[in-house]
A protein has these predicted regions:
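Glycine- and acidic-residue-rich phosphate-binding/metal-coordinating active-site segment common to enzymes
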Residues: 121
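A conserved ligand/cofactor-binding region detector
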Residues: 1-117, 125-128, 135-210
């Protein structure tokens, strides 16, 4: 692990999000997840604040390259989502292109109001995206089931959503998902990304190492 490059990246990302430092954590945790082999890719947005975009700082892509990561970027064709420039980061160009392709298919399978238009494509796209992002299969499966069946967000669901990071954990396998994904990522963040760890630990409503 190139600790020096990681710290330089963290510094630049937090400088960009200086007004709302908590917004820096998704980028850094996504990159860390790819670096430790927990997830094949990460999906981010080229955010814009005060007229400047994250990747206007040309040093950031150079550091990602230094870390052995590939960066792809692009916009979706659907008007509702075209205003965002999406960033696809992974260890190979092929993985980034896979994520980009499946995210395009996902966006085309829903309406502007979020209604599923093509159930088969929507389900396949979510399964593929979940796998490319390294999410536990049990969590992806429950998310798909709840959406397809139109289940309400009950108290149990909202409590799981409130205490966990990264993705929506399933009801039955929440603990296994946490220990197989969240905990491993959080331990790496604690070791390599001090600013990110500080911000994440400050949110006492979210699980950290237990």
């Amino acid at each position: 692990m190139n600790r020096d490059a990681l710290l330089r990246l963290e510094k630049l990302v937090f400088e960009f999000y200086w007004k709302r430092k908590n917004l820096a954590t998704p980028f850094m945790t996504g990159v860390m997840g790819v670096l430790i082999g927990l997830k094949p890719t990460t999906l981010q947005v080229n955010d814009e604040f005060d007229g400047k975009k994250l990747l206007d700082n040309e040093i950031i892509p150079k550091i990602l390259d230094e870390l052995g990561l590939v960066l792809a970027k692009g916009r979706l064709r659907r008007a509702q989502m075209a205003k965002y420039e999406y960033l696809y980061v992974g260890k190979t160009k092929e993985l980034c292109e896979d994520l980009q392709g499946w995210y395009e298919k996902f966006s085309n399978s829903i309406s502007d109001e979020g209604k599923i238009l093509d159930r088969r494509v929507w389900i396949e796209a979510n399964n593929q995206i979940g796998e490319l992002l390294g999410y536990p299969k049990t969590a992806t499966a429950e998310y798909i089931r709840r959406q397809v069946e139109g289940l309400d967000m009950d108290d149990n669901y909202m409590m799981r959503l409130g205490r966990n990071n990264y993705y929506i954990h399933s009801e039955k396998f929440e603990e296994e998902e946490f220990r197989g994904y969240d905990l491993l990522l959080n331990l790496a963040i604690k070791e390599y990304l001090p600013k990110t760890a500080e911000i994440m630990q400050s949110n006492t409503e979210k699980r950290w190492l237990e």
